[in-house]
Amino acid sequence: MKRGLDFYAPWCAPCKAIEPHLMTTAQSVGIKVEKLNVEEKRHMFDKYGVRTVPTLILMDGESETARLSGKMNLESIKSFLGG
């Protein structure tokens, strides 16, 4: 089952900007997105080797299938999630 991991920080302006696009697109393609706050889930950032926010990781089961980092827009999110 595909799922998304959204690595973000509450102070990150690009993270805030993509949230509505990410959630709407994910819902439309049937992908559940788990939001992971750098300030609360540091161990998850280390586990997945995330060094910048925002970072989106697409998972199929326990395997990473794709990663997108840095500034994003609606089109890049749709392309990434297959929407």
Q: What is the meaning of each model-derived region?
A:
Residues 4-5, 33, 56:
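Hydrophobic beta-strand anchors of alpha/beta hydrolase catalytic cores
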Residues 38-45:
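Structural microenvironment flanking redox-active thiols in thiol-disulfide oxidoreductases
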Residues 31-34, 72:
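Charged, surface-exposed interaction regions in soluble eukaryotic proteins
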Residues 60-83:
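Non-catalytic, surface beta->alpha helical segment in thiol-disulfide oxidoreductase systems
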Residues 12-15, 56:
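The canonical Cys-X-X-Cys-His
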Residues 14-29:
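Typically the conserved alpha-helix immediately C-terminal to a functionally engaged Cys/Sec
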Residues 1-10:
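Short active-site neighborhood of thiol/selenol oxidoreductases, capturing the structured segment around
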Residues 48-57:
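Structural micro-motif
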